[in-house]
Amino acid sequence: MEFKIDEQTLNDLELFNQALDGKSIFSCFNTACSDGGKACIRKMLESPLTDVNKIRERAEAIRYLGQLPFFLDIRREELSFIEVYLQQEDVPQRSMYHLTSRAVKGWLKPDNDCYLRQRAVPYLGRLIRELGTFMDELSVGKVPEMIRDMQQRVKETLAREGMQYLMSQKKDSFWTRESLDLYFRGRELDGVRVILDTLYMLDSLRSLGTMAKDEGLTFPIFTGSERRVRIEGLYHLFLENPVKNDV
């Protein structure tokens, strides 16, 4: 069940609307590198979890990624370029004639669509490879359940035909990019979305974990004995010298 915060409560809590000093809760935690990662953080605030198990899993994932000594190289401009590329309306046809004629036209007289493909496809291919490598480098037995689920989804996605074709390519060429475009915007489009959505979620969780570590914030401790909240040392992030209180 999804819990949606109403507009009045959002304003009262100053989650998104800036206070007099120009700050909001969202601005404090909005440290993700990618636009997709920022969108994930915003959604977390707009629709908070209500299931204690899901809350625990997310907290464990945030803590884990925040302490991880290595991470993905998030290239915001490349990701934005990829998103524009995926929104092209002319979905390529899977025929040798169409592919050949389009490749020849692009080679002899490249237009804007060709330029977009030729730039975005290598960006996307590199991103897919890097995410696969990153997931493989995580120790399966020590990662939180939420991260393990992501690993499994990425593994299943990379096992698909189009992704295997990408992995098998040793050299980058004009023809290879045109061929990969058939997969990326065709039969593997949903797989590409899995890759991007996973990257954005990892980016958001990592940024929250890093922010918590840098600011000295603590993570909740869950107990199964009773349903109540107890907070020690609560203070307002916006104040320079806040007085801590127990609630």
Model-derived regions: residue spans:
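Conserved amphipathic alpha-helical "coupling/scaffold" segments
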Residues: 1-161, 165, 198-201, 234
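Extended, charged coiled-coil "arm/hinge" scaffolds of SMC/Rad50-like chromosome-maintenance ATPases
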Residues: 155-181
